[in-house]
Amino acid sequence: MLYVKNLEKSYYIGKTEYPVLKGVNLHVAQGEFVAVMGPSGSGKTTLLNCISCYIPYDKGIITLGGEKLGNMDETSLAKIRNEKLGFVFQDFMLLDGLTIRENILIPRIIKGTVGKDGENLADQLIRLFGIEHIQHKFPAEVSGGERQRTAVARSLINNPLLLLADEPTGNLDSKSSRNVIESFEEARTQLGATIFMVTHDAFSASFCDRVILLKDGRIYKQLEKQGERSIFHSQLLDVLKEMSNDD
């Protein structure tokens, strides 16, 4: 599904180069739920931005569904973002003047592709994420967790190949965070969604199939969940402590 090979990205201040990604290699299989963790400045968000085609990368290859990303004109990149990628951000990015249901449908409304299929998929997502009772309310009338579940539903309304999530629980309390992560799990198990999530939260990451740990622009370690989630959570905390002690 997603392949990243020898990815490099630097930023420049004046003539000084600051490497951020230093030869990153990874893959995400179809239907897999993968998290990326690491300390501030490790390259997590830059990696996500390269995969999402929002910033160019310097060297390497990124392919999604067999199609090479990068070195395209803006029209082609926008088409990939609109048709093959779904996005969930820390800030919910909902339109205050639209209802919850309308916010979920907005990607199809913009493209003029709502139709019966779009309405049926919206119904399915609304049921799946338990937001039937708020679908005709406005964002200001619902909780933060409900707004984020709405954002997850919106990200899936175009049946993307890959859902990208950047700190999706960063603005939520622990109960709402769990509800949102469980929404991702439901999307994966019920819809076959493929999810790539950047997070600083080991609890959220423990729901994933696999966690990639970045440090100083390189992959430090990868952990795969092989048993109970609580055990995986403890393993993640141990590795994060190990990373901190290596500084």
Regions found by a protein language model. Name each.
Residues 2, 7-207, 214:
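ABC family nucleotide-binding domain
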Residues 246-247:
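Short acidic DE-rich linear segments
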Residues 218-242:
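Conserved beta-strand-loop-alpha-helix hinge in the C-terminal portion
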